[in-house]
Amino acid sequence: MALNLRKNHPLMKIVNDSLIDLPTPSNISAWWNFGSLLGICLITQIVTGLLLAMHYTADTSLAFASVAHTCRNVQFGWLIRNLHANGASFFFICIYLHIGRGLYYGSYLNKETWNVGIILLLTLMATAFVGYVLPWGQMSFWGATVITNLFSAIPYIGQTLVEWAWGGFSVDNPTLTRFFALHFLLPFVIAGLTLVHLTFLHETGSNNPLGIPSDCDKIPFHPYYTIKDILGFALMLSSLVALALFSPNLLGDPENFTPANPLATPPHIKPEWYFLFAYAILRSIPNKLGGVLALAASILVLFLMPLLHTSKQRSMTFRPLSQILFWVLVANLLILTWIGSQPVEQPFIIIGQLASLSYFTIILVLFPIAGVLENKLLKL
């Protein structure tokens, strides 16, 4: 009898065990589609990014013009750029929904998978930040200046660290060059971390909406979930193309159509929408080091989720108190996102401070209390 190549070839069997014969819970919902959507986002960004890099010049005197040249003179250059810029937004939409799913259904109890996922989020944020600097518009330059300057809040070594990162005494040509190098490198780091993420996931298998073991009821990934994923791909890619073709600048900042000028500060310096919640938390503390620590904590607090889980049930499916808190947290993050886009004046300052406080309170205090309370109410 001939050997089945799919199951025996050293490379094909890895693909087979990850995408074809993978035993998968039979009841996972569309919330489990975002992992594969993130994979498609990464592939799209690497392909469009590579095509853009072929026409880009990492030099302060040429960067802005080279991006304009790509849009005007390169075949479909405008489309490639718009897909790449808006693809980043879709990447963040998918990752935030993916993390939200993990929080709701208790997926963070797969500790290794969860921790690698947070490192992936941090790497993605770094990639998006250095990428935003490359067109060398006003918001690129001032965004880079403001965010890199935050490192100067680190006691004793801060200023040295910032000048080392800049490669000089301000954001200038060396900064742009190294940011381009990092922006080219980091997506491949993300791809590598994704494989680690999947390796840990396949050690335990996927969680499911009920939060109970599903070993007794597994189905093969192909064809059931391959076809379901393809539907997700079609919906996401058609949305991305629609955004890139009909309103490519909807999510961008008009300030970035002006070439970078170190002598003129834009009236409102703000990052892209996907960083606004963290930016609002940073601004809500009237102390530089305190703000930087709060900014870091806003993401790093995710590492504590497995430790803060007090419920005897894994998922929130049958936990109404935690569900209410979860959706309050979502609303809270939307408020922070809105506040991050507003000028620093009343009433936005106090709203931002209250939203920042409630963000940490819900995660660190109220979720664990709700878990204990639900155990008592449900007599578990």
From Swiss-Prot:
Sequence intervals crossing the membrane: 34-54, 78-99, 114-134, 179-199, 227-247, 289-309, 321-341, 348-368
Organism classification: Eukaryota, Metazoa, Chordata, Craniata, Vertebrata
Name of protein: Cytochrome b
Binding-site positions, a ubiquinone: 202
UniProt record, GO biological process: mitochondrial electron transport, ubiquinol to cytochrome c
Subunit description: The cytochrome bc1 complex contains 11 subunits: 3 respiratory subunits (MT-CYB, CYC1 and UQCRFS1), 2 core proteins (UQCRC1 and UQCRC2) and 6 low-molecular weight proteins (UQCRH/QCR6, UQCRB/QCR7, UQCRQ/QCR8, UQCR10/QCR9, UQCR11/QCR10 and a cleavage product of UQCRFS1). This cytochrome bc1 complex then forms a dimer.
CDD domains: cytochrome_b_C, Cytochrome_b_N
Annotated positions binding heme b b562: 84, 183
Transport as UniProt keyword: yes
GO cellular component, one term: respiratory chain complex III
Additional notes on this entry: Heme 1 (or BL or b562) is low-potential and absorbs at about 562 nm, and heme 2 (or BH or b566) is high-potential and absorbs at about 566 nm.
Single GO MF descriptor: ubiquinol-cytochrome-c reductase activity
Keyword Heme included in the entry's annotation: yes
PROSITE patterns given in the database record: CYTB_CTER, CYTB_NTER
Family listed: Belongs to the cytochrome b family.
Cofactor requirements of the protein: heme b
Gene3D superfamilies reported in the protein's UniProt record: Cytochrome Bc1 Complex, Chain C
Classification via Pfam families: Cytochrom_B_C (PF00032), Cytochrome_B (PF00033)
UniProt source species: Vireo latimeri
